[in-house]
Amino acid sequence: MKKASQLSTTILTIFIVLAIGMMVKGTVGKQRLCIKVLTNASHVSKGASTCDSKLCTSLCEKISPQGVSFCKPIATTGQSKKGNPVCNCRYWCRSDGTPHTT
């Protein structure tokens, strides 16, 4: 009789631990990598657009302190040639797109 009681207690404990784990996973959510284009870090001068890397870094850090910024040309519509460089900010975010803070 004692062994049956110990077995049921063990099974109950396992289910409780699994239930708590599922609740924690649901509240924390999965992280994913987000990329945001920051157009206000680009300047137009003499008909050509340039990306200010210092301004790009500063704006990206405002979005997420762990964010990584880089200036990257984007392809122009309908063409395979590279277009004007724009500021991109890459950071870890939640499923809703908000930055993940640690």
From Swiss-Prot:
This is Putative defensin-like protein 152. Keywords: Antimicrobial, Disulfide bond, Fungicide, Plant defense, Secreted, Signal. Disulfide bonds join C34-C93, C51-C71, C56-C87, C60-C89. It comes from the Eukaryota. Its main location: secreted. Residues 1-29 form the signal peptide. Transmembrane segments: none annotated. Belongs to the DEFL family. It is found in: Secreted.
